[in-house]
């Protein structure tokens, strides 16, 4: 019975719980606090604190009721809490659960449930603060691409909604300060998945990309890539926070594993940028490191390669114990009507996977129908999950019945009465039907007007009574044509003005017109009282005057003025006696005659001008005896013919004799016009001609004709420049030379033909850098030697390296014929061996041999068991013999290559390699010797990821060697001994490292071992630089992490090596000498951050002089001196540093040479 009662209460509580809205009613503030070290306050950079106002009224809200705040474009809540309480005065009235949208939804929600503390008598209100971060994109998912357009830099309006209640606030978002043209990266923590979404956008290429490779991978093994959640695309643009706003497919190849994701792409069009994003799981999502591949070729540009490494740090969004679990997000379709996010039950002691379910409703299709009825009905055609359900909505509509009636209003009104219980509604239409109206207007004593309507029953007459105050009166007196006086009153409408018009008979009028000085006319009426006489005064401006002069028959002059009425024009008529007349006749260019009278002013003389067309003219030219010419015109009357008589003096005469084709002589006179020259032409038969051609010194040709008198012989003289000459040399079979000149006609080219006996020929074959062969013949002048040069591509070379029993190395090149393969045979002496003993944690001893390349040193590593108290041991020295040669001249080239590698906060390594090539010039007859010496400087940083040094300690081995190579002719064997020893130990007292010591000796055929100190000087010194190799090997640090101070250990070794070669030189000259100094140093630094830095560098300088004098007798002695000052560093296990002088180690080394 109790169980049934409990179930009943549960059912009742569920049945009565409802969804309410409008609880959140104000957006009070939205402020930003920097949750990390962000450089700008963008919408996606935590934390934005939203303060919202809320109100719960117990009369409308009940315990168990729910309400939801929908927050568009909110990505997550930046808190480890899962809920927040709405409290007032310490009392909780509702609990709200955080549901972050993250990568699943474009919005976040706050789902709240009313608590039992809310009763009908309580109305609670207050504020709540929500820490959150907005979503403005960050991946290529559909959710992020949609939210990438939520905001822009500057002022934005953020709007949340609680049901139909919207609350808003304006906020200013700052633009990203990262240059969008470079590569772009972003990482964002997804708290519900305990994962990070990581984005990488390629650098901008304005014209598109030809090809490229991009991606990222874990650096220290603390990151795993989720290959099932990857987006790859190209975006048309970026928003103000450098996130893609679109994603389009393109051609690429993807390689993904748990260690990294990489894509290789080609042909990205202009305006697009490729990007890739993925989910990653990190040991600590708030601190991890990624290495990025960044290679690309812009269209029309060069290949770019710029890899980089980034260490990401952040803040924790969840409790400390929540890290390390696997969280899976799944989507499930349910029969609910809204989308929700829920977390399935999870027991960390039993379950291994926490599941977040995204519950989505079954999609529906709505069909709307209608019918005649009262209620709306809904019917659902269900469908299984995975299909689409159908909702049929049947909406009712009513029919109507219209009732029309009349009323006394002035408009037609329509009223619809909806029947709530039936499908027939009533429409009442009222049509106006007014009574006739009678309006009566009357005046009364009040100063205001009133209107009173007396309404009669329908069908009768209504009365409108208007009472008006009396009108104002204006009296006007005017004249009219009658002879008596009348008075008329015009009553205006009420509120207007009445008029009283008095009409009087007109007064008699007297008009006076006068002229005045103004240019206009005025009329002034002087009105007399009624019955008197009015006066009209007209004032006129003076009239215009037109003066006309005319002739009359009298011999005297008269003037008459005709006055016009005012405003007209007065006329002045002047009559003059006629003027005397003069007639002039002239010719003009027209073909007709005209007569024109030019009237002069009265009293002068008029002119009659007759224009005649010109007469025809006849010109006659005749010669006379005078030496000048004259022209005389005899003018005829108009219409006849004029005569022009020209008299010319006689013309000059020019006589010309010319030849023609006839065999007889003629004379012709050509008369020129007067003043010209008459010509007398004598034509003679042609003379016979003789032509002569000769050469002269000028560069052009001329032709001169020497004409003889008629009947004789003419001469034509042609002068030609000398011809050009072409000399051709050819070989023939005779043993002697000949020269023949072939002369061409003038203006052409003479030929000089030289015949030479054939030259001797020398053929030379040489190699060049091209891949094909050519043959070139260099022809020498006659009598010389022709050269045939055959250029062959270099032969392929096969190098074979083998060991032999000698202590020196040789290189022999066997040159094959062109087109075949040369063989380089390198014979190397066996490598020297260095034995190193190390201690390890195993209970047995083993040995490993590390074989170096020829010329290097093989290493035998003996791994021995470790005991708590172990005596330091020294490895027996190993001797390496080197045979060296001394050359006359050294040419030295140096090349340095530096490579830097950085890995986040774990430090950087720099490796610098310098290579020197020593060669002998080709112009001396000594064998070519090439010696390469490398200098390597390595700086490294070691770090313990856990922050605790290992107890096994650190072993630092420093090896420093100095080599001097020389060549002598004839060769004298020289031995260079290299001694390497290593000291090992545990964390107790004792040395941990020692330098290598080089002892050099000079041996001739009769000596065994000689060590001495000597110095030699030379006058001609050429300073060169030779580098000496050095190496540093370091294992784990041994300093305890409890030390707060930094410990610095410095090891310095200085050595001076003097190599002197003396020559017993009877012919004189300087003996070659060499001086070498070496200064290696090692610095070790340890600090409380568990970082040890070791740096080894070695510099050596060498000076050398050479003799050019031929050596006839040689006796050689090699001396070496080594001075070593070295401080050994010992860690005693407690963090103290003990330094020991290394003279004892050096002594042990020397003693070991004789063991």
UniProtKB/Swiss-Prot annotation:
Give glycosylation sites per the record.
Answer: 471, 543, 615, 651, 723, 759, 795, 881, 1023, 1099
Annotated propeptide span(s):
1135-1155
At the top level, the lineage of the source is: Eukaryota
User: Major location, coarse class?
Assistant: membrane
Keywords recorded for this protein, A-Z: Cell adhesion, Cell membrane, Cell wall, Disulfide bond, Glycoprotein, GPI-anchor, Lipoprotein, Membrane, Repeat, Secreted, Signal, Virulence
Q: What is the effect of changing residue 820 to G?
A: In allele ALS3-1
The record's subcellular locations are: Cell membrane; Secreted, Cell wall
Q: What is known of its domains?
A: Each ALS protein has a similar three-domain structure, including a N-ter domain of 433-436 amino acids that is 55-90 percent identical across the family and which mediates adherence to various materials; a central domain of variable numbers of tandemly repeated copies of a 36 amino acid motif; and a C-ter; domain that is relatively variable in length and sequence across the family.
Q: Indicate what this protein is called per its UniProt record.
A: Agglutinin-like protein 3
Species assigned in the record:
Candida albicans (strain SC5314 / ATCC MYA-2876) (Yeast)
